[in-house]
């Protein structure tokens, strides 16, 4: 569909490459769910098909070229607008405002599937480019006024004699944007403090201190933990980023070379993977050393699935129990969300049940597996093994029966 769309513009020839990504505009959702009827109203907006907050974005680009195209499609594949980036010095016959508006009215549905008769012109403007070309901009508003101060709008621009953009969007009041920014700032402050507490106090303070004590007392057990950390960092960070290679070109600046951009991306992936390796290694070593000291009779985690241990009744019981506890944990999470939303006014925004961007990756099945791999290892080590084992050792050291398991 994107290839067919780009062929309608002479300035986008067959030599242009394409990249795609699934995009969501959350501004209208935030306004509607908080101020204008909640999730039911937002679902109604999606169903009436006047405005689509979910879209596939397809980019047509070429190395060294300023000219590029961005085509937008609804989830069902119908066209939902586009934007052609045209250089200021591009020569094209200039039109009067009346002729430019007539051109828009005649051709706007070529790459947009809305009903243009439901829109009224509310604003128009023009700008003269350095080469004398006249560019026009027209802003339309939908007749339906059922979302309070928010509005369904459509912007069309004409560069010379080319309709270079048709952009449907939702206008959200500036007052709400400021209010929402204040809400987000509180959440961001909490997140910053939590990250500081996690990295500064929990990981660096407790983790590094524990490693030093283990090393001095000969308790340090790290070889297999380091190998596990390297495995997780490689498969859950570096390779998962490489899996999204087709989508990274959405951020490519055509003013630079493709080789330079790709080198920068690869270096960033490797650097992030190395950083994650050190964090994982410190977490795994701390967890293994603590649990071996606190629970010397427990099965060592890295030997669980070895041939002479995996067939034991203890491993079978632990595995069955782990699966049986999953529905209990899911029920607790669900109950927490329901309690917070209904009784304490917490807001949980609506979102897709899955991320279609997985389909744009090289191996769609791999990303979910990689994320689960890291979460399963790291959360088990850092948020279960470390605090439980530390509590046991503290209890043994100070004879505190409440935390002496």
Language-model segments: residues:
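Conserved structural-core and active-site-/substrate-pathway-adjacent residues in large, well-folded domains
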Residues: 1-2, 77, 104, 161, ...
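Exposed beta-strand-loop-beta-strand "reactive/processing" segments of non-cytosolic proteins
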Residues: 7-75, 120-160
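Long, charged/polar, surface-exposed segments that mediate recognition or autoinhibition
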Residues: 57, 61-63, 69-123
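Short, solvent-exposed cationic patches
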Residues: 94-114, 179-208
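Membrane interface segments of multi-pass transport proteins and intramembrane proteases
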Residues: 391-401
